[in-house]
Amino acid sequence: MVDLEAAVEAVHRAESAVAQHDWFRAWGPVLTALFIAERGFLAGEDAAWISEIRNQLTVLRLRALECYAATELGIAGTELAGAVRAGQQLIQLAPLRESGYRYLMNALAAQDNLAEALAIYSQLCDTLREQLGVSPSPATRELYQQLLAAT
């Protein structure tokens, strides 16, 4: 439980730093949170309290991946590949959570892979339409329009 508490504290510090665009201050705490959240918890065991801890770790991992993607985008340069990986992981873990798609689209566009970024938007549209019958949020549509304008 100590690790979970440390990870919660670390992701909170990382989120605060990201909100202030202090990418280098976010770096250490976000890595701590990711390392803890990705470890898993009592593999092979099954109890209600274990499931609750696993759910908390999953939510924590999503928050940490979002912070990591934002931090990598903020640092830019050679760190953009990390933002791409984080966006891909977010999409895999939570395919209906649009933030992962936006991080991935931004990272790909920053790497001059604009067509690939636009294809990610199309993938999101298909997923949302098939699963929920809805369109992307205004924030995601706005990012798509910005990327289109850059072509």
What residue ranges belong to the model's regions?
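Intrinsically disordered, charged and Pro/Gly-enriched terminal/linker segments
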Residues: 1-151
